[in-house]
C-alpha cells in the first residue's frame, strides 16, 4: 500500500518506523526544517528518512498547487500525518483512495489543537493518551480509528509524559496499522458535545500568576519546564525561571507572591504555598531553591510577581487578524517600534512575522478565523482595538472563487464586527478603494462619491460589494448601537512582502508581484487590455504611518470616520509601472542571475482573469480626510517603492536559486 507521510518530531519518527515495520510503501515524507533547539531533545524526521533512503521534502507551503500536483502524481493509497505542524488542504486529503489519518496526542475529542501534552498537565489531568483518527478539513475532528490511554503521574513533566506518549503510539501503531492495510478498521464519530480546543502556547504564557493555587502553579511549572522555556516570575525587573517545585498544603495570611522562607525557598500562593526546588536567574546557573534566593538577594516578605514596569504602564492591546499578511506584518513592526502596544495576532502562517516571534509584546497563534472562533471572541473581549485584516484581495480570485470571497470577506468578518459590538470594542476595518467601483469622479471622496459597480454577471464585483456592505453594516452599528469604528480605504499599497512569487505563479497576486515574476522567470510581461488602466501607488511605509495614526486616534478624531489612504501624486498606468520596473530590473546588481527580458504582451482581460471580469480605468483618492484627521501626507516617490520592492523579491529569488 503506497503511503505519503507528513511528519515531525519524535512521534513522526515513531510513525515512520511503524509504517516500515508494517510493510507500507512510503513514497515520500514531508517534514519541517529541523530546529536545533528541538532536535537536542527530539529525533529528526529528516535524518531518519535519509537513513531509510526515503524521499524527504520540507516545503514552506505544502498546500501550494505545485506540491499538490506532485503528490497527485505519486497516487498514494493512504496519507498519514504524525505531528506535522501545518494543516493539510482538502485538495491533499482527497488524493488518498483509502483515506488520510492523523495521530493526535490526546484522547479526542478532548484537547484538540496544539500542545495537548502541555495543556493536559497544566489543567491537572490524570489521564491522557493518543488517538489515530481520520483527517477531515476541521482539525482533529474526524472519526476515531484507535486510542491508547496513558496515566499522568503527579511528578510527570511535559518531557516525561512525551516519552509515555511515544511508547503508547508504538503500541497503538502495532495494533491498528495492519487493520488499515487490510482495509478493515473501526471508525467511531467523535462526540462534538465533548470537544475541547486549545491553541498554541508561547514562552510568554509561562508567566506565573501567584493568585492561583500552589497546585495550579506547580502544574504550570511541570507543563513548561525543560526542554520548554519554563515558568517564570519577576523580582522587580529581574526575571526568575522556576524549573522544579513542590506544592505545600500550608495556610498563610500573606499576599500571593510573598517570600515566606528563603531556606527552603517558599512562596505564598492564592491557596497554599510553593517550595522552589530548582530555579535560575536570567544570567545565572540552574541551582537549588535556597541558592537561587541567595543569588537574587531575596529576603523574607519580599514579593515576586509581574515585572515592575508592566505594573506601572498599561500598553494598549491590539488584535490583528491576518497578522502575517502584507499590511499585518508591516503594521506589527510599526506598533512594536513605538513601544506602547501589545499585539495579539492570528494567521494561518507565520513566514512574514518570524522576526517578531521572540518579542515579548507580540503574541501569535497559528489559526484560521473560520475555525478558531472561541479564541477570536476571547481576544476581542481582551483587547482594546481590533483590526480584521483577513480577506481575499487578489482580482483573479474574484472571478475564480466568488463564493469563497463572499464567505471569507463578508460572512466571517461580519462575525468579528458583531463581537466588537457585543463587547464594546473599537474596530478599525479595512475597506478598499474597490468600493468606489466605476465612480466617475476625478478624485474619489469618502463622504460624497458614488459607489458604482457593474452588472450581476460581472462577478469580479463580489469583492467590492462584500466590502461595501460591511462598511454599511459597521456604519449602522455605529449609528444605532454606538460601535466605535474607523474605516480605512487603501489605494494600491505596495512594497516588500506584497504577496510572494509562488502566489504569483498561480496568478493569485497583485500587479507588481506578477510583473516581477515575469522578469525573474524570463516570461513576457502580460499587459491586461494593454495596461492602460491608471492607479495611484502608495508606499507601504506611508500607508502604515497613516494606519498607525488611526490606531493612536488622538483626541478621538478618527471615531466614526472613513479615511482614504493613498498617494494621488503617484498616479501611473500599469504599463508605466511595468516600464519603470523593467528599467530598475535592468540596472539591478543581481540582473545577471535572471533570463533576458521576454518583452511585453498584450492580453484581453477576459482571457487573463476569466469570464465575469470588468476593469476600472482610473482610481485616484481624495486624501482630505487623512490630511485633516491624521495630519498626514504621503512622501515616498513611486520609483523608490518600486526599487525597494524589486530588490526584496530579487534577493529572495537568488537565495532560492542557491538552494536548488
UniProtKB/Swiss-Prot annotation:
The record marks 102 as: Transition state stabilizer. One of its GO terms (cellular component) is membrane. It comes from the Bacteria. GO terms for molecular function: carboxy-lyase activity; UDP-4-amino-4-deoxy-L-arabinose formyltransferase activity; UDP-glucuronate dehydrogenase activity. Pathway: Nucleotide-sugar biosynthesis; UDP-4-deoxy-4-formamido-beta-L-arabinose biosynthesis; UDP-4-deoxy-4-formamido-beta-L-arabinose from UDP-alpha-D-glucuronate: step 1/3; Nucleotide-sugar biosynthesis; UDP-4-deoxy-4-formamido-beta-L-arabinose biosynthesis; UDP-4-deoxy-4-formamido-beta-L-arabinose from UDP-alpha-D-glucuronate: step 3/3; Bacterial outer membrane biogenesis; lipopolysaccharide biosynthesis. It catalyses: UDP-alpha-D-glucuronate + NAD(+) = UDP-beta-L-threo-pentopyranos-4-ulose + CO2 + NADH; UDP-4-amino-4-deoxy-beta-L-arabinose + (6R)-10-formyltetrahydrofolate = UDP-4-deoxy-4-formamido-beta-L-arabinose + (6S)-5,6,7,8-tetrahydrofolate + H(+). CDD domains: Arna_FMT_C, Arna_like_SDR_e. Its EC number is 2.1.2.13, 1.1.1.305. One of its GO terms (biological process) is lipid A biosynthetic process. (6R)-10-formyltetrahydrofolate binds at residues 114, 136-140. NAD(+) binds at residues 347, 368-369. It holds the Pfam family Epimerase. The record marks 140 as: Raises pKa of active site His. InterPro entries: Arna-like_SDR_e, Bifun_polymyxin_resist_ArnA, Epimerase_deHydtase, Formyl_trans_C, Formyl_transf_N, Formyl_transf_N_sf, Formyl_transferase-like_C_sf, Lipid_A_modif_metabolic_enz. The active site is at residues 104, 434, 619. Keywords: Antibiotic resistance, Lipid A biosynthesis, Lipid biosynthesis, Lipid metabolism, Lipopolysaccharide biosynthesis, Multifunctional enzyme, NAD, Oxidoreductase, Transferase. Residues 314-660 are annotated as: Dehydrogenase ArnADH. UDP-alpha-D-glucuronate binds at residues 393, 398, 432-433, 460, 492, 526-535, 613. Homohexamer, formed by a dimer of trimers. HAMAP family: ArnA. Bifunctional enzyme that catalyzes the oxidative decarboxylation of UDP-glucuronic acid (UDP-GlcUA) to UDP-4-keto-arabinose (UDP-Ara4O) and the addition of a formyl group to UDP-4-amino-4-deoxy-L-arabinose (UDP-L-Ara4N) to form UDP-L-4-formamido-arabinose (UDP-L-Ara4FN). The modified arabinose is attached to lipid A and is required for resistance to polymyxin and cationic antimicrobial peptides. This is Bifunctional polymyxin resistance protein ArnA.
Amino acid at each position: 500500500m503506497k503511503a505519503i507521510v507528513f511528519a515531525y518530531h519524535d512521534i513522526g519518527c515513531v510513525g515512520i518506523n511503524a509504517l516500515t515495520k508494517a510493510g507500507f510503501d512510503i513514497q515520500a515524507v514531508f517534514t519541517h526544517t529541523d530546529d536545533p533547539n528541538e532536535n537536542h531533545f527530539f529525533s529528526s524526521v529528516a535524518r531518519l528518512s535519509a537513513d531509510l533512503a526515503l524521499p524527504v521534502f520540507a516545503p514552506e507551503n505544502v498546500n501550494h498547487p505545485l506540491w499538490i500536483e506532485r503528490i497527485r502524481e505519486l497516487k498514494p493509497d493512504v496519507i498519514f500525518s504524525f505531528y506535522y505542524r501545518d494543516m493539510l488542504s482538502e485538495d491533499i486529503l482527497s488524493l488518498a483512495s483509502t483515506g488520510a489519518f492523523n495521530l493526535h496526542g490526546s484522547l479526542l475529542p478532548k484537547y484538540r489543537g496544539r500542545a495537548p501534552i502541555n495543556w493536559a498537565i497544566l489543567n491537572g489531568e490524570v489521564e491522557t493518551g493518543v488517538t489515530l483518527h481520520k483527517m477531515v478539513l476541521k482539525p482533529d475532528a474526524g472519526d476515531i480509528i484507535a486510542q491508547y490511554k496513558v496515566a499522568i503521574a503527579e511528578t510527570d513533566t511535559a518531557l516525561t509524559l512525551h516519552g509515555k506518549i511515544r511508547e503508547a503510539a508504538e503500541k497503538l501503531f502495532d495494533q491498528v496499522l495492519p487493520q488499515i492495510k487490510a482495509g478493515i478498521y473501526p471508525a467511531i464519530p467523535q462526540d462534538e458535545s465533548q470537544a475541547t480546543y486549545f491553541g498554541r502556547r508561547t514562552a510568554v504564557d509561562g508567566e506565573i500568576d501567584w493568585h492561583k493555587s500552589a497546585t495550579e502553579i506547580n502544574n504550570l511549572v511541570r507543563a513548561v519546564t525543560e526542554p520548554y522555556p519554563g515558568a517564570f516570575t519577576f523580582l522587580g525587573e529581574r526575571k526568575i525561571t522556576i524549573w522544579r517545585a513542590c506544592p505545600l498544603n500550608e495556610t498563610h495570611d500573606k499576599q500571593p507572591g510573598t517570600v515566606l522562607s528563603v531556606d527552603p525557598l517558599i512562596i505564598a500562593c492564592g491557596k497554599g504555598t510553593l517550595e522552589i526546588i530548582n530555579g535560575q536567574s536570567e544570567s545565572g546557573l540552574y541551582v537549588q531553591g535556597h541558592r537561587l534566593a541567595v543569588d537574587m538577594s531575596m529576603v523574607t516578605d519580599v514579593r515576586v510577581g509581574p515585572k515592575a514596569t508592566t505594573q506601572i504602564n498599561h500598553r494598549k492591546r491590539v488584535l490583528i487578524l491576518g497578522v502575517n499578511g502584507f499590511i499585518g506584518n508591516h503594521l506589527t513592526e510599526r506598533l512594536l517600534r513605538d513601544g506602547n502596544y501589545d499585539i495579539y495576532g492570528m494567521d494561518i502562517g507565520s513566514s512574514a512575522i518570524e522576526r517578531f516571534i521572540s518579542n515579548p509584546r507580540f503574541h501569535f497563534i497559528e489559526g484560521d478565523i473560520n475555525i478558531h472562533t472561541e479564541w477570536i471572541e476571547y481576544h476581542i473581549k481582551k483587547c482594546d482595538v481590533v483590526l480584521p485584516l483577513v480577506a481575499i484581495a487578489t482580482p483573479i480570485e474574484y472571478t475564480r472563487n466568488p463564493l469563497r470571497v463572499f464567505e471569507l470577506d463578508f460572512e466571517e468578518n461580519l462575525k468579528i464586527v458583531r463581537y466588537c459590538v457585543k463587547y464594546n470594542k473599537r474596530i478599525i476595518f479595512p475597506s478598499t478603494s474597490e468600493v468606489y467601483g466605476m465612480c466617475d469622479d476625478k478624485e474619489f471622496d469618502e463622504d460624497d462619491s458614488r459607489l458604482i459597480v457593474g452588472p450581476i454577471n460581472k462577478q469580479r464585483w463580489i469583492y467590492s460589494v462584500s466590502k461595501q456592505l460591511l462598511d454599511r453594516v459597521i456604519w449602522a452599528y455605529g449609528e444605532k448601537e454606538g460601535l466605535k469604528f474607523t474605516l480605512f480605504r487603501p489605494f494600491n499599497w505596495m512594497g516588500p512582502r506584497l504577496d510572494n512569487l509562488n502566489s504569483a505563479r498561480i496568478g493569485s497576486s497583485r500587479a507588481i508581484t506578477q510583473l516581477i515574476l515575469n522578469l525573474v522567470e524570463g516570461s513576457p510581461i502580460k499587459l491586461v487590455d494593454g495596461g492602460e488602466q491608471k492607479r495611484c501607488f502608495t508606499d507601504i511605509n506611508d500607508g502604515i504611518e497613516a494606519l498607525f495614526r488611526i490606531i493612536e486616534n488622538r483626541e478621538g478624531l478618527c471615531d466614526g470616520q472613513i479615511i482614504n489612504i493613498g498617494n494621488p501624486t503617484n498616479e501611473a498606468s500599469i504599463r508605466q509601472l511595468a516600464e519603470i520596473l523593467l528599467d530598475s530590473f535592468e540596472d539591478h546588481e543581481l540582473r545577471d542571475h535572471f533570463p533576458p527580458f521576454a518583452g511585453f504582451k498584450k492580453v484581453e482581460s477576459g482571457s487573463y482573469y476569466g469570464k465575469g471580469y470588468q476593469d476600472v480605468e482610473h482610481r485616484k483618492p481624495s486624501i482630505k480626510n487623512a490630511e485633516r484627521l491624521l495630519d498626514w501626507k504621503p512622501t515616498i516617490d513611486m520609483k523608490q517603492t518600486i526599487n525597494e520592492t524589486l530588490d526584496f523579491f530579487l534577493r529572495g529569488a537568488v537565495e532560492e536559486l542557491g538552494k536548488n
